């Protein structure tokens, strides 16, 4: 079963961990792009993307899904399911 996981906050991390531990075929993790944070307003990775990268997942962070190229990349993963948790 091919899965694309979508989320951004720390709330989504346990769900992704369960899928990994159950050895599901998570093709990619979609998350929101980095956000400006702190006093210096430097860009900071969103929690799920940071976790997914540390676990070796392919991470996509599109600004919008209105772009046909973004949709084409999503389709290229040929997912059977999209799992969305706190996107």
Which role fits each region the language model picked out?
Residues 1-87:
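One-carbon transfer enzymes
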């Amino acid at each position: 079963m091919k899965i694309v996981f979508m989320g951004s906050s720390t709330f989504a991390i346990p769900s992704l961990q369960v899928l990994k531990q159950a050895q599901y075929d998570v093709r990619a993790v979609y998350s929101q792009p980095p956000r400006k944070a702190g006093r210096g307003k430097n860009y900071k990775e969103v929690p799920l993307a940071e976790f997914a990268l540390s676990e070796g997942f392919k991470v996509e962070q599109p600004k919008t899904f209105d772009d046909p190229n973004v949709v084409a990349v999503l389709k290229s993963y040929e997912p059977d399911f999209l799992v969305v948790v706190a996107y």
